[in-house]
């Protein structure tokens, strides 16, 4: 009941609470790349646990080595900014222009994004739905909106000057 509708599918049915990703659908509806349904409160809790190196409310959830593995560049594909399940800052990162080099994040097809900045202890969560009511309504600038919102969060925390000259931004 707390999940918003995703989109109207090709059968003219409103999808709500089910993964709408075609690849996940072909894999039985559940896959590691799509279909996270959550709230900002739950994502903030999870993000704080990741920021704490795997601990939340004095309970260890993940080993520090696991968090480090999840959030370090995998380099499976040379030059990739991908971690195991996350992305890291590079080029035009969805986390905006002020995230530190010690950050990791993830985006979703519907325009959602989550970035966790370990250096600055900042978490920015954006839950949106750029494909509602139909994915054809998805604006090509939705990615830019996410960048602007993440950047505005850093500006509001007076972190703009601290991070505006990081090396990876030279290609921005």
Positions of PLM-derived features:
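Short, gly/Ser/Thr-rich active-site loops of penicillin-recognizing serine hydrolases
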Residues: 52-56, 65-66, 71-74, 134-172
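Short, surface-exposed loop or secondary-structure junction motifs
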Residues: 1-101
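Short beta->alpha transition motifs characteristic of CBS
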Residues: 107, 127-131
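Short, surface-exposed beta-strand/loop micro-motifs that present aromatic residues
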Residues: 103, 110-123
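A broadly conserved detector of short glycine/acidic/proline-rich loop/turn motifs that flank catalytic sites
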Residues: 90-92, 120, 129-130
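Short, glycine/acidic-rich beta->alpha junctions
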Residues: 28, 106-108
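Short intrinsically disordered coil segments
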Residues: 100-104, 143-144
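Glycine-centered small-residue hotspots that permit tight backbone geometry or close packing
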Residues: 17, 108-111
